[in-house]
């Protein structure tokens, strides 16, 4: 049933038509979403995401510092080792024995010229000799220090004791070394390349390096200057490079990572 109503002017009107006219008469608010503003919004969002990504990468790189260290050299194979490190743009520190330095002076000079760090590993690498008395470790390190300085002009305070500073480096031995400014460097990743003479040592290093890095610690990797290590080293260097690890050298002004006795040190005699 159609109901007719009387308008204020006295004319009859259809309410549905009146409503439609009222709707048509209402102004519609328009939003200006132009293409230029939309593009600007997208660009800003991209820039914010890029900045977040760059910050994350910077933090990631900062926390992924690795120290490669090589003991017992130099050797007839050290030149190949340096070639490999340079090929992968890796830095490293070499703890060397006095007699070996004298036998391979050119490669030691090359280390220095190419920005590698050099340190002392003693003279004898014989536990019964280097740990025979409180001043014996100091004597060997002073001799090694002089050999390096006379050859290269570099005054290094970096030392690594044969077999590490535990258990044979007693407290009195440590005091003598400290008084002469030596920095005793041990390690927190033992490659065991002296026993695992194949790529098993690489797998071990990769696992322990990743674990330490995730924990926010910088891996100090113990390796040896010998043919078996050099043979499988490319696998390790390639992994470090692809996973954005940054290698650095040890320096005289760093606080060293040193094993603490905690009741474990004793005299060998």
Predicted regions and their residues:
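N-terminal pre-catalytic segment of deacetylase/amide-hydrolase enzymes
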Residues: 1-69, 74-87, 207, 239, ...
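Structural recognition of the beta-strand scaffold that forms the well-ordered cores
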Residues: 67-69, 92-96, 117-122, 157-160, ...
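Short low-complexity, flexible loop/linker segments enriched in glycine and/or proline
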Residues: 108-110, 134-136, 199-202, 262-266
């Amino acid at each position: 049933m159609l109901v007719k109503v009387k308008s204020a002017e006295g004319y009859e009107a259809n309410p549905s038509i009146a409503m439609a006219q009222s709707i048509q008469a209402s102004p519609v608010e328009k939003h200006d979403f132009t293409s230029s503003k939309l593009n600007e919004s997208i660009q800003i969002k991209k820039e914010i995401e890029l900045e977040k990504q760059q910050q994350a990468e910077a933090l990631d790189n900062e926390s992924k510092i690795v120290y490669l260290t090589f003991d017992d050299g130099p050797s007839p194979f050290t030149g190949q080792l340096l070639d490999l490190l340079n090929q992968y743009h890796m830095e490293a520190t070499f703890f060397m024995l006095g007699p070996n330095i004298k036998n391979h002076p050119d490669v030691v000079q090359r280390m220095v010229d190419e920005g590698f760090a050099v340190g002392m590993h003693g003279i004898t690498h014989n536990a019964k000799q280097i740990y025979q008395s409180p001043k014996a470790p100091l004597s060997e390190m002073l001799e090694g220090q002089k050999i390096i300085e006379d050859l290269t002009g570099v005054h290094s305070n970096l030392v690594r004791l044969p077999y590490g500073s535990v258990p044979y480096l007693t407290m009195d031995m440590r005091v003598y070394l400290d008084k002469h400014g030596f920095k005793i460097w041990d390690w927190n990743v033992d490659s065991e390349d002296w026993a695992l003479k194949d790529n098993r040592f690489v797998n071990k290093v990769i696992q322990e390096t990743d674990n330490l890095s995730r924990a926010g610690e910088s891996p100090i990797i113990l390796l040896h200057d010998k043919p078996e290590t050099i043979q499988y080293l490319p696998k390790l260097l390639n992994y470090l490079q692809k996973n954005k690890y940054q290698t650095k050298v040890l320096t005289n002004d760093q606080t060293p990572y040193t094993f603490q006795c905690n009741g474990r040190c004793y005299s060998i005699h």
